[in-house]
Amino acid sequence: MRTTLRASLFVLVALLLGCAEPKPEFVQAETHLSALRSAGLVPKALGDIEVTAVRRIQSLPTRWVRQGRPFWWAELSCDDGAAGHLAWTDDGRLIDFSLEGLSAVITPQAFALAGVPPIQQFPLKAPDGSAVASGCVPTAGASLVAFWSARPGTASWGGAGEQDLVRRLRGRMRMGVLPDLEGYTDGKMSLAGAFPDELAEALQADADERGVDVDVALSGYDRRLLGAELSAGRPVLVSCVVLLPRKPELSWGHQVVAVGRAEVGGAHYVGVIDNFFTPRIPGSIRWIAEDRIAQLVLVRPRR
């Protein structure tokens, strides 16, 4: 009810000020923003948020993803600069969003853990001297290891630094390297990937070698299982297919760290720390529709 009222007020104010009736896509963006605010997912520190641009995106086919249906993408801003983004389908279904500075939340509709370092992918030198990405799989794994290494009982799982952790896990996996034909990195480096089962094996072997008492397990996506892990203070690695925020016409298979869950308007979302996403405020959570999640990698201390 509040969401509908706020959107209606947005239209009314525009008319009273003598403005043309707002475009439907801007009204839809305001409606989504109101719903997120009601769910406690809009940081008060952002102040007044403005929908500065809305565009219709035609998704592009890639080597991994078929061409999807067009969708809408909105850029948000506040007095301090960028405030986040929203993405939704033609039928109004919210599929992807982020609000700057939201790094933890506890409300009746949402919950998210803080403390997972937002390690970003970085270029490495290939044997032929060219640049290749560190890869989302070991980079996400390193963020999770860094989280646990900052906690009693698992502190010995750390390393000399964040990139050292990435390299260490990467060295335990068979990484596939492919040229960046689609422009994910604007051709700056080749892409690198690995499978979730190899990540699980690498994490278990790395923990065992350092005397870290944890169990690592694979699971298909399960909302209740994910919620239980997060409520117990355990972030979860997830495999997903997501939009590329800096180029939303592109999608790809991705590995990230799940830190949150939310229900907005009857739909369910997973909050993640993304390793190929650079918001204005580092550590801001990105939220994706749960139907984009395929697999979970669980890490559980034994005591």
Language-model features: locations:
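Conserved active-site-adjacent core of cysteine acyl-enzyme catalytic domains
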Residues: 20-83, 89-91, 97, 101, ...
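Positively charged n-region of N-terminal signal peptides that target proteins for export
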Residues: 1-6
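Generic structural marker for isolated residues within well-ordered, non-membrane alpha-helices
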Residues: 10, 141, 200-203
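Bacterial N-terminal signal peptides
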Residues: 7-16
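Non-catalytic propeptide/linker segments at domain boundaries
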Residues: 74, 93-115, 119
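Active-site nucleophile-adjacent alpha helix/oxyanion-hole segment immediately C-terminal to the catalytic cysteine
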Residues: 25, 120-168
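Short hydrophobic alpha-helical membrane-anchoring segments
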Residues: 15-19, 147
